[in-house]
């Protein structure tokens, strides 16, 4: 029987664009299911008796930590197994968990469902980035990844429009609760979750390309692709991490335990200060898991470790973009609750305008950013990071105006340009990390990139805005306080800009020195 990885032999440009189209739709649904919580937040807060910090936890941390944590072993599986099958399974899982969100009666139940959504969605981008990197040549890669990333904004925008419309119509039709006692926000979860199960059938029909074909470095399939996945579980999931560390020796186990103790102490201190035990327990779990994984990777796969964790340039890009995401995710989540509270806007109208502006602005931003990044790279190896820097600098003034104006029309008008500018950096940053590793490492590189966007951005940004809002009594203050991280992001990206040409030029040599047989 032919191995599924060898059933497609040569790149096909038309089919590559077809695959990209399907993956954009998948990513749109990914963000519909992820982002719809924003338009439902005020209703959930009222019905489940939650606070702003709780909402930030549900949207960001409960989802984001487990998305990042499971993204590591699933990224490894994407490097070794049939990527189309992996996306198909993940899509079915996260759609089912979104559907279950609609039956939640407590904050704890909703948090558990959000964790499940995070685990399922962790399959998507490592597999998609790897697939697209094999279907598209290097000179078109940032454009392809930017188009794929547009699904983030299209899906996020659609979620607000769909969610607002469903909640309003459902509550009008069933003011005391509908079938099974479901209220509007619960019906919205069901409406966006169930279609994903059908989409999974379509995704399963995609062909699997030869790994490394677009770079001329064909990587043969592994005879036992799940071995690496299981190994990663022992490096990421506590308490399996202790077994994994013990297998490497007494010293690695001692270091792992010491770091774990430091994390527990730090999480306890932050929980004592804020009162948010679940938030900091989850952040501590994520930090410990990432440390355990990186430590094991250094022993087990030194070439991959050296090109990812041993590369200052790679890490600077991850942190730099992660801090952009820190603010962007918070703005994305809190914009709808903000206009409902401050301007008393209707849910359906706000969802339509902010959702439409976010979708259009995000789509334009990632497409223009990707094309501009590819263009600048032709004459400057670090040219893509100029675009990333634009995404870190340009939106700040518009954000400050948006969350201080007393004019609702101006607030709405600023949403499109603000989203467009903040989305410039995504395709450029993602493509930069893909270029800094070998083809077989792309899934792991993508998982690492998303550690920054999730543990730094998603798991902390919305929560911190909510926590500052709760402390200050002002959601505007909560969101604006996040601008304090912008200078750190800019510094990281500027240093990466200076070091990137040397890092790319030395890629193969560093891999050989680390033991890669090339």
Protein language model features and the residues they cover:
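Extracytoplasmic gate region of multi-pass secondary transporters
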Residues: 37-38, 248-282, 312-359, 366, ...
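Central cavity-lining transmembrane alpha-helices of secondary-active solute carriers
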Residues: 58-76, 129, 356-369
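Cytoplasmic membrane-interface "Motif A"-like loop-to-helix N-cap segments
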Residues: 80-91, 374-391
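Helix-loop-helix hairpin linking two adjacent transmembrane segments in secondary transporters
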Residues: 148, 152-211, 244-284
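C-terminal transmembrane helical hairpin of 12-TM major facilitator-type secondary transporters
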Residues: 381-429
């Amino acid at each position: 029987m032919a191995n599924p990885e060898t059933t497609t032999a040569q790149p096909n440009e038309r089919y590559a664009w077809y695959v990209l189209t399907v993956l954009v739709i998948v990513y749109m649904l990914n963000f519909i299911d992820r982002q719809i919580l924003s338009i439902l937040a005020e209703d959930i807060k009222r019905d489940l008796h939650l606070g702003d910090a709780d909402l930030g936890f549900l949207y960001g941390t409960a989802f984001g930590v487990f998305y990042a944590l499971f993204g590591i072993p699933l990224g490894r599986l994407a490097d070794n197994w049939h990527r189309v099958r992996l996306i198909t399974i993940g899509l079915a899982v996260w759609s089912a968990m979104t559907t279950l969100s609609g039956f939640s009666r407590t904050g704890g139940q909703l948090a558990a469902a959000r964790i499940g959504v995070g685990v399922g969605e962790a399959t998507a981008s490592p597999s998609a980035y790897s697939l697209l990197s094999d279907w598209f040549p290097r000179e078109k890669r940032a454009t392809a990844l930017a188009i794929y990333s547009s699904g983030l904004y299209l899906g996020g925008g659609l979620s607000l429009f769909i969610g607002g419309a469903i909640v309003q119509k459902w509550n009008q039709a069933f003011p005391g609760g509908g079938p099974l006692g479901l209220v509007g926000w619960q019906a919205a979860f069901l409406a966006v979750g169930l279609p994903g199960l059908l989409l999974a059938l379509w995704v399963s029909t995609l062909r699997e390309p030869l790994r490394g074909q677009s770079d001329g470095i064909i990587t043969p399939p592994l005879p036992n692709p799940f071995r690496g996945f299981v190994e990663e579980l022992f490096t990421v999931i506590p308490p399996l991490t202790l077994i994994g560390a013990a297998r490497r020796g007494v010293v690695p186990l001692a270091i792992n335990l010491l770091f774990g103790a430091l994390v527990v102490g730090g999480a306890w201190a932050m929980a004592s200060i804020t009162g948010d035990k679940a938030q900091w327990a989850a952040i501590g779990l994520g930090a410990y898991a990432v440390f355990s994984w990186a430590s094991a990777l250094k022993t087990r796969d030194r070439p991959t470790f050296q090109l990812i964790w041993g590369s200052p340039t790679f890490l600077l890009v991850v942190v730099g973009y992660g801090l952009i995401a820190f603010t962007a995710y918070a703005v994305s989540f809190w914009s709808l609750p903000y206009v409902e509270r401050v301007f008393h806007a209707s849910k359906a109208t706000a969802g339509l305008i902010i959702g439409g502006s976010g979708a259009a602005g995000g789509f334009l931003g990632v497409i223009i950013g990707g094309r501009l990044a590819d263009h600048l790279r032709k004459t400057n190896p670090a040219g893509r990071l100029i675009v990333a820097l634009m995404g870190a600098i340009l939106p700040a003034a518009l954000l400050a105006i948006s969350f201080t104006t007393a004019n609702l029309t101006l607030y709405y008008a600023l949403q499109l340009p603000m989203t467009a500018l903040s989305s410039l950096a995504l395709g450029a940053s993602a493509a930069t990390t893909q270029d800094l590793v070998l083809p077989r490492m792309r899934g792991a590189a993508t998982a690492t990139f998303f550690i920054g966007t999730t543990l730094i951005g998603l798991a902390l940004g919305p929560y911190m805005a909510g926590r500052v809002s709760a402390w200050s009594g002002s959601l505007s203050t909560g969101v604006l306080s996040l601008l304090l991280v912008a200078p750190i992001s800019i510094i990281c990206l500027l240093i990466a800009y200076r070091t990137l040409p040397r890092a790319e030029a030395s890629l193969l040599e560093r891999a050989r020195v680390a033991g890669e047989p090339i």
